[in-house]
């Protein structure tokens, strides 16, 4: 496995020098590897793609990067909850997890979606609980910033649990759904539910801000982003994987067409 830790411009012609640690399964460094490349496509995941660029800018390795690098990090509106105390039989529970999604366009404050998962536990335990991923629209965005005291990038998300827009809307919908469909919503943090989650953290090198519409990172030719860092914090009440894949494919199609 390799862990990239440094990206610098190549001095004599366009391109980059990339340094990485080759590591074993205990995360011990085996050796340092250096690659001399014409193009870099960043796909380390939203946080780590952004972290590499934030640290490179702060350390002077890539000083021309946009000041918007690190901005616009969101949780995709994800809010995890569960229901128990169900009175109706909802079918077999040992073939799952079952999956379904629905949208409520009439919910106050804007539409909401919810994914239903039947818990894949043996009978009768599996009939005691269903887990649900609620997704809401939220304008709340954090930033990934360089911490000079530690020499690393870190996420700053200044929205408190329970009082954030995301948490309040998610909690409200969990109770709304339970009133309509039955059961008792579980939104306690003690049980691991009831707050925004980072299953789908998105942003940091946002489209048309820190990167252009084609995925090119502003400030440097030949540097591209092809993962969730390109997304603007949320993608509209869905799992973002297909949207990320589609924009990455679009970036590569346009790259091939112009190079």
Where are the predicted features?
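Glycine-rich loop(s) and the adjacent beta-strand/alpha-helix scaffold that form part
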Residues: 3-11, 19-93, 227, 247, ...
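FAD cofactor-binding and catalytic pocket of flavoenzymes
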Residues: 66-178, 201, 209-211, 219, ...
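A conserved FAD-binding loop/helix module that cradles the flavin
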Residues: 233-255
